[in-house]
């Protein structure tokens, strides 16, 4: 156990450091997501600058790079505390990727993937919370913030032994969204539908 957990933490960070948004945009001939749209290399920004196909590819890869290290560690019998650190390491890799100049995304999809191995029931509830919030508000960032706030309570209900590590993960996501929280408070955050309409008008 003592040797497996630190090794999985390093593996998770390196997996997280593979920025799928940047790679997909390069392969598809799209602008660098760090320099276009919102400047965030994540699925939402790729949706704005490249459309649904590219965004779905980024979303899937970002989820997998959080899911695979945690699932592997879970299968190896790593304890919940270490699983939390492994999940955080994957998100830290996404946020500060060593392969891309430490300029990454906000870690939402990767965090979702890291939580998924806890159970499909929890995964469905989390996805539903994010989707409902976005549909009602139009803010992708608000969906992430609300999901991060509620996630520890969901986990406590389904599998309480994972409440602490998921709480650590939620804190990381909320800290990463501090600029979005300020813009939402000032009513300066742009709705995702507005940005998509602007893109269609340009096209």
Curated annotation (Swiss-Prot):
Subcellular location: Cell inner membrane
Known catalytic reactions: sn-glycerol 3-phosphate + an acyl-CoA = a 1-acyl-sn-glycero-3-phosphate + CoA; a fatty acyl-[ACP] + sn-glycerol 3-phosphate = a 1-acyl-sn-glycero-3-phosphate + holo-[ACP]
The organism's place on the tree of life at top rank: Bacteria
Protein name: Glycerol-3-phosphate acyltransferase
Keyword Transferase: yes
Keywords: Cell inner membrane, Cell membrane, Lipid biosynthesis, Lipid metabolism, Membrane, Phospholipid biosynthesis, Phospholipid metabolism, Transferase, Transmembrane, Transmembrane helix
InterPro entries noted in UniProt: G3P_acylTferase_PlsY (IPR003811)
Functional summary from the UniProt entry: Catalyzes the transfer of an acyl group from acyl-ACP to glycerol-3-phosphate (G3P) to form lysophosphatidic acid (LPA). This enzyme can also utilize acyl-CoA as fatty acyl donor, but not acyl-PO(4).
Gene Ontology biological-process annotations: phospholipid biosynthetic process
UniProt keyword annotation of Cell inner membrane present: yes
Gene: plsY
TM region positions: 4-24, 53-73, 81-101, 112-132, 138-158
Topological domains annotated Cytoplasmic: 25-52, 102-111, 159-203
Residue spans, topological domain Periplasmic: 1-3, 74-80, 133-137
Membrane topology classification: Multi-pass membrane protein
Pathway: Lipid metabolism; phospholipid metabolism
